[in-house]
């Protein structure tokens, strides 16, 4: 995978947890539209410390499973602790780079959230996700278009942050406007 430009591991876990909490309703509605049901076998690619993985595991219930994958071994350990604290036992884990992850026809639902815009070759990861789902399975990608980020009333500090974040993502090979290309 290309360089993740935000702080990960333990220092980034709180930020990702807050983001998951803030977006929880939208994420659930997205999963509704994608047809995610109880009992599904899911891939959570780029799971980070597992803030969204908790919701995914609860959504599929005890008859379903989630494989949480991230290249950051510290994030995987944090995800394991988060699942244990939540009493969730239907999640397994793998430390793997999104480019190198290999699975064939194993999942009903392959999910990625806020990962692809960091990558210089997102089509390769989408191909990996495609290969991982069973025939009739679903690939669901939740990502951003930072050109759509705004603040009202306008704020110079916010605009500075948005523009610098986009520059850093581009500098490391990503595309901060990738979200607009997803269907």
What does each of the following model-derived ranges do?
Residues 3-23:
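Class I SAM-dependent methyltransferase Rossmann-like catalytic core
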Residues 21-41, 55:
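Conserved alpha-helix/loop element of class I SAM-dependent methyltransferases that forms part
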Residues 43, 49-100:
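Class I SAM-dependent methyltransferase SAM/SAH-binding core
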Residues 61, 119-120, 133-134:
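Helix-to-beta-strand junctions that scaffold the AdoMet/dcAdoMet cofactor pocket
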Residues 100-109:
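A short acidic, Gly/Pro-enriched loop at the edge of an enzyme's catalytic core
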Residues 108-122:
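A short SAM/SAH-binding and catalytic strip from SAM-dependent methyltransferases
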Residues 123-138:
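A short glycine-rich, Lys/Arg-flanked "PGG" loop and its adjoining helix->strand segment in the class I
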Residues 140-183:
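Conserved catalytic/acceptor-binding region of the Class I
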């Amino acid at each position: 995978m290309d360089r993740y430009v935000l702080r990960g591991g333990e220092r980034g876990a709180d930020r990702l947890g807050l983001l998951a909490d803030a977006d929880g309703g939208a994420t659930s509605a997205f999963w509704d539209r994608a047809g995610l049901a109880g009992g599904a076998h899911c891939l959570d690619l780029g799971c980070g410390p597992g803030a969204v993985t908790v919701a995914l595991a609860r959504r599929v219930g005890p008859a379903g499973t989630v494989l949480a994958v991230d290249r950051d071994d510290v994030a995987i350990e944090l995800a394991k602790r988060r699942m244990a604290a939540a009493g969730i036992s239907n999640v397994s884990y793998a430390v793997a780079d999104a480019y190198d992850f290999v699975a064939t026809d194993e999942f009903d639902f392959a999910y990625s959230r806020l990962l692809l815009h960091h990558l210089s070759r997102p089509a390769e990861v989408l191909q990996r996700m495609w290969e991982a789902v069973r025939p009739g399975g679903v690939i669901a990608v939740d990502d951003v278009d930072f050109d759509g980020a705004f603040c009202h009333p306008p704020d110079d500090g916010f605009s500075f942050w948005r523009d610098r974040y986009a520059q850093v993502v581009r500098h490391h090979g990503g595309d901060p406007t990738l979200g607009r290309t997803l269907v």
